[in-house]
């Protein structure tokens, strides 16, 4: 199976490679990294090859900046690009402050600005996938803002799914707190990326969330940096991204005195 990663020069790529190396059942034979920065993608490809070799994984890693060659005969195409790089991220995280809004690249005005730059590029890439990849190839979107980008892909008729690590992060944290394997956790995960809530945590057919809210309310609130009283009132655990709304003024004050994520 061939997987193409568009934005393969990203620092997130080694994390993906680590995950693939621990799941040989995926039967990956080729990982093709595509990125406009040829030097950067070759560096990431070298790291990726060493990681796979250390894990004994047989997949070969190919790198380049030719999108057509990259997606040719691909079974899956994963998108993790940032149009304009960290410079535009810095803009998205700062200009909203001028109008008393949170600066963030997935939600709010910064997220919409990023969507305006990103959606046209993603749709262009998707058309290349439609033309040159295998019939039925899935596009997997990690590119933010995930909800808007994935919706654009679907409305254009592409076979696509948008992924976010919020749900699996909660699944793992709840599993650790309850002393069970993550696969035993069934989440009632509702909302749109990244604005989601966990409204149930089911283990062996029983919802354990009410008990967790009663016994671990402070810990759960600390995880998402929100007031315990809010979680108790909701009866759910919000994504930490919802802090930008539930605690808008507090977060804005923090952003004005701290480095942005792009700077960090």
Give, region by region, the residue ranges found by the protein language model.
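Redox-cofactor binding/interface segments in oxidoreductases and associated redox assembly factors
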Residues: 72, 78-79, 141
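The conserved SAM/SAH-binding core of class I Rossmann-like methyltransferase domains
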Residues: 6, 34, 163
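N-terminal Rossmann-like dinucleotide-binding module
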Residues: 2-31
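Rossmann-fold dinucleotide-binding core
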Residues: 14, 138, 142-205
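Rossmann-fold NAD(P)-binding glycine/threonine-rich loop
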Residues: 83, 87-156
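Long, compositionally biased stretches enriched for glycine and/or charged residues
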Residues: 179-264
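NAD(P)-binding Rossmann-fold cofactor-contacting core
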Residues: 25-51
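Short acidic low-complexity segments
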Residues: 60-73
